[in-house]
Amino acid sequence: MTYSQVLASIQSTSWPDFAVFYIFLGGAMTCLGLSSTFHTVSCHSEKVCADWNRCDYIGIVTLIVGSFFPMIYYGFYCAPLLQAIYLGMISLFGGATIVVAVASHFRSPEFRWFRTGLFIAMGLSAIFPIAHALIIYGWRLCFDVISLNHMLLMGSLYISGALIYGARVPERWFPGKFDIWGSSHQIFHIFVVGAALVHYYGVTKTMAYWHAQNHSCQKEIELMVPS
């Protein structure tokens, strides 16, 4: 089921539903757009390569932050204060990550694992809102209210891709064999696209669940039925 199909099937959606989805979608498009531009122009000159490499890092952060928005919005659908706290947390974390990632000092090859670890840590900060949601709703209901299974799969894909990229596998084992196809960077991008698609599907399921079960926030959590 696509996002458009979900919107067409329910009447209770409002502007925040559109906003959080398009923030996520915009983050994904920004990430992939900046990355593809970087790879296209990186051979132009050292300066152009360095400038667009910074844009590439900014795109990664934008995707991570954008992915948080629908998860936090629906995870705390009836708790605006918690929404604000966690959205503020990831936004500040994202801003700090951009400042560090684009600094000239940290762009050198010897800081590759530092940058990789920074992006992984940023993604793993989702543990805090997810743990909070588990306390509020319980394990079973979280598969619906935040689409926990999709969240876990998405996180696994992002982390796996980042580790492959950081380890430079498989080209480190077979130098010169993956210069055109099959390099770690290409594998990383495949994992990123897969994770974004998984999250897209999870967001549509979560939105459909909330609007079917408790869109007005008048039902007690104990009365919400797992799908």
Language-model segments: which ranges?
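Multi-pass alpha-helical transmembrane bundles in non-GPCR membrane proteins
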Residues: 1-227
